[in-house]
Regions:
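Extended carbohydrate-recognition surfaces in non-catalytic/accessory domains of CAZymes
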Residues: 1-61
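Short, aromatic-rich amphipathic segments at membrane interfaces
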Residues: 130-153
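Hydrophobic alpha-helical transmembrane segments of multi-pass membrane proteins
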Residues: 154-172, 179-199
Length: 199
């Protein structure tokens, strides 16, 4: 999705049906929308926790397109033209942070040439309106991309588990009471949990 991208900062008023009026305004691209250089963050004032981003999906023939992207500390809704097709989290303050999350959003095969709009919310101004990465491709290509990005984690996990088991057997067999071995085993255990969480 290499553009052009437009943004609009703030909370959208509702129309007569209760839907955000800026969804339809994104389709017609009225005067309230401003161009920005994607993938950079839009130049926001920081006065509102909401931003709207919109672009047109490239006009291609798709079979089973999937939009893959990652976000950090943001909740959002995604609209295809004027229809909401995906939502993540609540667009209100939450007790706990959303952290970093990746999303695989299936799109209809006829999505080429249609407008894609994001309504984004965050209490972290430096994160609002920013994607860590984004790609639109066929489903098999997206799964291949995801596996390639996770190969370092997938290979490190079994090695880490084997090292933990070898060290545990060594300590139990020799009845070693040195705290250093306990700390090293704890490191391997926590590192394994981290690897599972990031993959």
């Amino acid at each position: 999705l290499d553009g052009p991208w437009y943004y609009r900062e703030g909370f959208s008023p509702a129309n007569v049906t209760g839907a955000p009026s800026w969804v339809r305004a994104a389709v017609t691209l009225d005067a309230g929308w401003q161009l920005f250089n994607y993938p950079d963050q839009p130049p926001l004032t920081g006065k509102a926790p909401f931003v709207w981003l919109t672009t047109v999906i490239p006009a291609k023939n798709y079979q089973s397109p999937i939009l893959f992207f990652t976000t950090t500390e943001q909740s959002f809704r995604v609209y295809l033209d004027t229809t909401m097709i995906y939502r993540y989290g609540s667009l209100t303050p939450q007790r706990f942070s959303y952290g970093s999350a990746w999303h695989m959003l299936p799109l209809p095969s006829w999505c080429g040439g249609h407008r894609l709009t994001f309504e984004m919310y965050s209490t972290y101004p430096h994160r609002l309106g920013q994607f860590d990465r984004m790609a639109l491709d066929e489903s098999d290509a997206q799964l291949t991309r995801l596996l390639k990005e996770d190969i370092p984690y997938l290979t490190a996990l079994p090695v880490n588990i084997v090292m933990f088991i070898f060290l545990l057997v060594y300590v139990l067999k020799r009845r070693i009471r040195d705290r250093l071995y306990v700390f090293v085993m704890l490191f391997f255990l926590l590192f394994s949990v981290w690897l599972v969480g990031t993959s």
